[in-house]
């Protein structure tokens, strides 16, 4: 089970009220700034939470992020490190607010399949079912394409499922989102490994486009002094 206890709604709204005391929101990943990598409109949905407009906050949050329940739990939160309140105080608890928004959206049934009735008849293959592959699948399906996701493991999710422990993010969050994506028309094929069960040239013939979202499972070594010391392991081990 996740070890983080959700904050009460009033505490979340109080935290959201601390936002926008800055002239320039450094929490955005603007040119020259190192804030949110996906450009979440953080001040906007913080203000909506402060006003109690949770459903609109969810729409705003999902406009830039397909899976805020994932990032709200496991993202290192460069937005909080960039918050200008760090100069005089602690930053706004942006991750906690993000989690609260999406969790409340699920609880209230605001997150529903978005099905495009106008199909393009284009067939798209996606290799890998991690967050990048799933986000691409969802967006392309909503654009009207026929999308098939191929995953070497039996279950979908990539490192979200096989690399993130339950105490940081429970698998129910992945399964719930997969149900939504499947309802939107995306097909999933597990136990299919590229280069073993299927060749890339065959996939290229079968699809109008193929996306490689295989992830970064192979660690990168560092040729630096002290690398051979005891107790140093790859993060992927």
Locate predicted features:
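Ferredoxin-type iron-sulfur electron-transfer modules and their immediate structural context
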Residues: 1-123, 171, 210-236
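Feature captures the FAD/FMN-dependent oxidoreductase FAD-binding
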Residues: 56, 118-119, 123-127, 175-224
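Residue-level detector of alpha-helix initiation sites
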Residues: 66, 130-132, 155
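Short, well-ordered alpha-helices that flank and scaffold nucleotide-derived cofactor binding pockets
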Residues: 103, 138, 142, 237
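N-terminal Rossmann-like FAD-binding beta1-loop-alpha1 element of flavoenzymes
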Residues: 123-148
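Short amphipathic alpha-helical segments
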Residues: 138-139, 161-162, 222-226
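Rossmann-like dinucleotide-binding cores of NAD(P)H-dependent redox enzymes
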Residues: 146-149, 153-190
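Short low-complexity, flexible loop/linker segments enriched in glycine and/or proline
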Residues: 162-166, 204-208, 226-228
């Amino acid at each position: 089970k996740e070890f983080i206890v959700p904050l009460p709604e009033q505490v979340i709204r109080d935290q959201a009220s601390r936002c926008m005391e800055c002239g320039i929101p450094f929490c955005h990943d603007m040119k020259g700034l190192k804030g949110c990598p996906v450009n979440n409109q953080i001040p906007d949905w913080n203000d909506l939470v402060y006003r109690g407009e949770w459903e609109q906050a969810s729409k705003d949050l999902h406009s830039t992020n397909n899976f805020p329940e994932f990032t709200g739990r496991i993202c290192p939160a460069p937005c909080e490190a960039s918050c200008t309140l760090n100069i005089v105080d602690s930053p706004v608890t942006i991750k906690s607010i993000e989690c609260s928004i999406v969790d409340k959206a699920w609880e209230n049934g605001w997150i529903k399949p978005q099905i495009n009735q106008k199909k393009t008849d284009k067939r798209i293959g996606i290799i890998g079912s991690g967050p990048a592959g799933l986000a691409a699948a969802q967006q392309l399906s909503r654009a009207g394409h026929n999308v098939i996701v191929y995953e070497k493991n039996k279950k979908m999710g990539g490192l979200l499922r096989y690399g993130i422990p339950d105490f940081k993010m429970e698998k129910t969050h992945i399964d719930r989102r997969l149900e939504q994506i499947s309802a939107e028309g995306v097909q999933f094929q597990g136990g299919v490994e590229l280069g073993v069960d299927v060749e890339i040239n065959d996939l290229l013939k079968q699809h109008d486009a193929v996306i490689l979202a295989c992830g970064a499972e192979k660690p990168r070594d560092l040729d630096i002094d002290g690398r051979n010391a005891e107790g140093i392991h790859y993060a992927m081990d």
